[in-house]
């Protein structure tokens, strides 16, 4: 039997984007073929998908690192790099994804639901994509971006309609085994059940699931016993059923005190998904009291004594015996009625046809602030300038000049001048710090330098038709050579 794991920490890393290619087309009789470097492929995503055939997070317990494929670099001949392969991870129904700070990112309920845990990096553009009228043959390309990388916490919260709560050895597992076809481990010692057991119960035309949660003890909401680890499996339950051991001989225990102690723990526990599930706190869920083991001598008499107390609280009470199966039929009908009422009050939303709409993303904004750690320095923050820096190959002068042009067009340079930045001031963008040299005053010279232009366009050794005609006339003596005049 596989080990049940309901909480893991998963480190996900998406694939890196491939670098763009800086290449010039080479073909016979075409000395100026132009740039033909392809773009790099995007990195693969790490995706979580609900699979109804998966029931535990065991795979992630033994393999806590997940990495998607990297994108391939672009090649000459306008060949784009291959995209990195996505990594699809199967998770059980009811998996909750949280970040390291405990914030819920997504609640995966329903077969086929997906969540992109880490997005792959964008591939860099090749020099063919960077070519323009002013930059006919760029001698550089853009680098691919790194993919997202982060730690996620996966918690499994059972998807059941009815949750059985009670002290250890109250008979919860036995009840699940007789109400459904489930075969949980049953033994006569505390904490026999260490993992939640799910069973499917059919009553008339209603079918519902029932969950046997490991035994709770006072202090469970603070982590005593196994309660803190398994109370979360009750968060999705629409009905809570107290299973009370009427045959216990433990000193200081009786059905009323047992239920009161468990109610205190349920009231102290605050479900993280209460608002999302629409069920409210555990203390507000419908209750059913199941007085078990009434086939034991004196247990039936005790059950009769405590029944009025629970009835006065407005809770239905059922006296049963999981061993002899006495009283199970009315209990099953009552649970089915409560589940049916909940489903009628909370109908499932009809599946909507997915409509894909582009999301407008404004990356034009940026901020410039003085650097508190560097006198006279500045820090530039913004999605676009930081991405440009990550894509720049700083050992290529053309690439650095292209970055400077882009920052100037975005308005970063004007903002630095407005804030009083001096030439040579250290400016930090992302993880890169450089000495700033203003280019606004040299804007005309910047255009004349032909940055990113193939030098062969300016230095051509080809002889024109007029020059060939003049040379022929010189050889025949029809005209004098210009150099001999």
Swiss-Prot record:
Provide the E.C. number(s) assigned to this enzyme: 3.6.5.-
The record's Gene Ontology cellular component field reads:
cytoplasm
Q: Where is the OBG-type G domain?
A: 160-340
Residue ranges of the OCT domain? 358-438
The entry's keywords: Cytoplasm, GTP-binding, Hydrolase, Magnesium, Metal-binding, Nucleotide-binding
GO-annotated biological processes: ribosome biogenesis
- Indicate which residues the UniProt annotation says bind Mg(2+): 173, 193
The primary site where this protein sits is cytoplasm
The EC class name is: hydrolase
Which is an annotated Pfam family here?
A: DUF1967
HAMAP family (UniProt xref): GTPase_Obg
The family note in this entry says: Belongs to the TRAFAC class OBG-HflX-like GTPase superfamily. OBG GTPase family.
Function as written in the Swiss-Prot or TrEMBL entry: An essential GTPase which binds GTP, GDP and possibly (p)ppGpp with moderate affinity, with high nucleotide exchange rates and a fairly low GTP hydrolysis rate. Plays a role in control of the cell cycle, stress response, ribosome biogenesis and in those bacteria that undergo differentiation, in morphogenesis control.
Assembly and partners are described as: Monomer.
The name under which this protein is listed is: GTPase Obg
Species assigned in the record: Nocardia farcinica (strain IFM 10152)
């Amino acid at each position: 039997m596989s080990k049940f794991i309901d909480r893991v920490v998963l480190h996900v890393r998406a694939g890196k984007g491939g670098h763009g290619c800086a290449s010039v087309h080479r073909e016979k009789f075409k000395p100026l073929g132009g740039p033909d470097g392809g773009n790099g492929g995007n990195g693969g995503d790490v995706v979580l998908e609900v699979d109804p055939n998966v029931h535990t997070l065991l795979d992630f317990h033994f393999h806590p690192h997940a990495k998607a494929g990297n994108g391939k670099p672009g090649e000459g001949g306008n060949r784009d790099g291959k995209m990195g392969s996505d990594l699809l991870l199967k998770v059980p129904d009811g998996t909750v994804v949280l970040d390291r700070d405990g914030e819920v990112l997504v609640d995966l309920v329903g077969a086929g639901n997906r969540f992109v845990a880490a997005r792959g990096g964008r591939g860099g553009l090749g020099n063919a994509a960077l070519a323009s009228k002013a930059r006919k043959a760029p001698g550089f390309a853009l680098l691919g971006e790194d993919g997202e990388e982060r730690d996620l916490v996966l918690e499994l919260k059972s998807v059941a309609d009815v949750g059985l709560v009670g002290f250890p050895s109250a008979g919860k597992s036995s009840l699940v085994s007789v109400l459904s076809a489930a075969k949980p481990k049953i033994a006569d010692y505390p904490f026999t059940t260490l993992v939640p057991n799910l069973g499917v119960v059919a009553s008339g035309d209603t079918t519902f699931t029932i969950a046997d949660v490991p035994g709770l003890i006072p202090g469970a909401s603070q982590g005593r016993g196994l309660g803190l680890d398994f109370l979360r499996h009750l968060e999705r339950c629409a009905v809570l059923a107290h299973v009370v051991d009427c045959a216990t001989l433990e000193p200081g225990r009786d059905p009323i005190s047992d239920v009161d102690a468990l109610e205190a723990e349920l009231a102290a526990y605050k479900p993280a998904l209460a608002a999302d599930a629409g069920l409210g706190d555990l203390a507000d869920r419908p209750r059913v009291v199941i007085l078990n083991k009434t086939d034991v001598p004196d247990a039936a008499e005790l059950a009769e004594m405590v029944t009025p107390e629970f009835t006065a609280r407005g809770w239905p009470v059922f006296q049963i015996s999981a061993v002899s199966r006495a009283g199970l039929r009315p209990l099953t009908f009552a649970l089915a009625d409560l589940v049916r009422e909940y489903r009628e009050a909370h109908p499932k939303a009809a599946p909507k046809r997915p409509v894909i709409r582009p999301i407008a993303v404004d990356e034009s904004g940026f901020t410039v602030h003085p650097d508190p750690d560097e006198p006279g320095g500045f820090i530039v923050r913004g999605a676009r300038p930081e991405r440009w820096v990550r894509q720049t190959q700083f050992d290529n002068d053309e690439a650095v000049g292209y970055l400077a042009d882009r920052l100037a067009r975005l308005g970063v340079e004007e903002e630095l001048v407005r804030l009083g930045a001096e030439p040579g001031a250290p400016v930090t963008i992302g993880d890169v710090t450089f000495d700033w040299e203003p280019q606004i005053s040299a804007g005309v010279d910047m255009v004349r330098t032909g940055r990113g232009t193939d030098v062969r366009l300016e230095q051509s050794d080809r002889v024109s038709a007029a020059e060939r005609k003049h040379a022929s006339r010189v050889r025949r003596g029809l005209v004098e050579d210009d150099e001999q005049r």
